[in-house]
Structures are given as structure tokens and as C-alpha cells.
Amino acid sequence: MSAIRRRWRFTGTVQGVGFRYYARAAALHLGLTGWVANNWDGSVTLEAQGERAALDALVPLIERSNRWARIENVEVTPLP
């Protein structure tokens, strides 16, 4: 299987609550590579690459892992 890439933009209470730490831990647990960063507007952007099943499992794992974050909206963009 070939790797695919996606970018997510999370809004809500996602800064100052360990969101990037838990997102990175979840991605590593699933065997994904990529990056995560805070944005000036209070949102967080995450880009990851890997197998489709792992990418599909990433957001639910982040939501279960971090009890302090409150994700209000997620925008997903497939990348080439």
C-alpha cells in the first residue's frame, strides 16, 4: 500500500491544553509521520502521512486521549 497525506485544521479549545503533544503521540502510535503547529488564530494545523486506516484513526484517538481539548470543528484536506 502507498502512503497518503492529509492536513487537518482544528478549532475550539485546542491551544494551551496539550493538544499538540497528544496529537504527536497519537500519530507516532499509529506509525504516521508529519507535523503539528499552533496557528495565530487559535487553531491548530496537523499534517500527517501514512496508511489510510491509520489516518482515519488519528482524530478519534486524539479526541479520546486529551480530556482538556474541546474540538469544535475539523477541516480535512487531502494532499497530493
Where are the model-predicted features located?
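Intrinsically disordered, low-complexity, mixed-charge
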Residues: 1-80
